[in-house]
Amino acid sequence: MVKDILAPGLRVVFCGINPGLSSANTGFPFAHPANRFWKVIHLAGFTDRQLKPEEAEKLLDFRCGVTKLVDRPTVQATEVKLHELRSGGRNLIEKIEDYQPAALAVLGKQAFEQGFSQRGIAWGKQKIAIGATMVWVLPNPSGLNRIKTEKLVEAYRELDQALIMSGL
């Protein structure tokens, strides 16, 4: 089981779709060697060094957290069922209402659209919010995603810069 890393007062909570098998086996988020999450959040400015999956709890030192839409591990996120994403979206809203981070970053456009019953959304900041929490949709850092690392860093950096401009 991959546990959430959450606390009140975070700048951002990154929300993955669901754990891959590497994460399920180790208990650490974004654990597959091909997953670029740890590299991307470092290069985008969220951490002062590249953390390892087993150091996930240290995200709290940088006022960052992680959660997921669906607890069930799969080989690919495409194996997650629509009803799981919808249920996960409802559960995620409750978590965000409880912890009230400045921003929620859902990592994947299709997962966001299905989990939040939205259509035709763009990358970046969304029109909806959860209380005072800004909602962003960023590309998923999975190694299965063909987007170049530089583009991932650029998208994540846009969120980091928006938080800095907000005084966070």
From Swiss-Prot:
GO BP terms in the entry: base-excision repair, AP site formation
Molecular function GO terms recorded: DNA binding; pyrimidine-specific mismatch base pair DNA N-glycosylase activity; uracil DNA N-glycosylase activity
Subcellular location(s) of the protein: Cytoplasm
Keyword match DNA repair: yes
Enzyme Commission code: 3.2.2.28
GO cellular component terms attached to this protein's record: cytoplasm
Domain of life: Bacteria
Role this protein plays: Excises ethenocytosine and uracil, which can arise by alkylation or deamination of cytosine, respectively, from the corresponding mispairs with guanine in ds-DNA. It is capable of hydrolyzing the carbon-nitrogen bond between the sugar-phosphate backbone of the DNA and the mispaired base. The complementary strand guanine functions in substrate recognition. Required for DNA damage lesion repair in stationary-phase cells.
Record-given protein name: G/U mismatch-specific DNA glycosylase
Organism, as annotated: Salmonella dublin (strain CT_02021853)
